Amino acid sequence: MCKIGSPLLSFLLCSLCTPLQEIINNNNKQNEILPSDLRSNDKQQVRLRKEFEKYPQLYYSGGRRDSTRVRNKEVFDPYLVAQTLLAFHGDCVTAYNSKKLIWDEDKEYTNIFSDQLTAEHIIFVYSLGRAIDEFKINLKNKKEQRTDIEDDELNFLSKRGSKMLLISAVSTCMESLLGKKILDSWRLVFKDNKNFDKLVEEWKAILDVLMPWHSTLEPAIVSGLKSKEATQNAAKQLRATLTSFSSMYAQQLKPFSDSINTDM
């Protein structure tokens, strides 16, 4: 029998308390109320979940948490969805620096998750974000085989905020990429959304064209992604550069343009 205050009793109590405390901490994390929890039954999230049912290979929770593990599907993280949408539609600074704010603040939330947002547009923008991730991974995997230009591209993509900045810049360049006026950027979608990996490859072809000019975007992230004016100016500079070489890249851009629903 252990006496009160004995070293053995103290050891036994500590041994029991440690895993118990871990269980409590894990439960507290799981039970933490997130802004997305409070929006999960919002009419827009309910509608978007329904729209995603057309694509059984894709999964969008709309902020609703489920203990069931999703398997063999492309999972769309709701916070990353909101970030990429906000960046694509003009505010990569808030998208990068305040991702929870998008779900928390009514104004930011309703600007993104409105009646005009569709599952197809989410797929369009989210696949761009994934293409940037994979483009960066491909550069990393080249290791010593990277060219000097590729080293510079990897250095750019490794900077804080570069992904959201690049998404915003691509959006600014969309008219030049498609060769036509865009009346409503919220209606930009792929014609066929069944193969997500193929859509990512479509975007990679665009990154192959734009990334060599990444230096035009550098001033916007030299001290972190902080200035909306700086990001807008940098994106416009990239657009001007692309436009000046548009005839040179016309054939290279045509497959991407053909894959987009131009009924806008």
What are these regions (language model features)?
Residues M1-C2:
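A sequence-level detector for short glycine-anchored, His/Arg-bearing signature motifs
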Residues L8-S10:
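An N-terminal structural lobe/cap that precedes and organizes the functional/catalytic core
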Residues L13:
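Residues at the C-termini of beta-strands that transition into short coil/loop
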Residues L16-K180:
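C-terminal catalytic or substrate-handling cores of phosphate/nucleotide-
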Residues L165-M264:
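C-terminal accessory/interaction regions of large nucleic acid-associated machines
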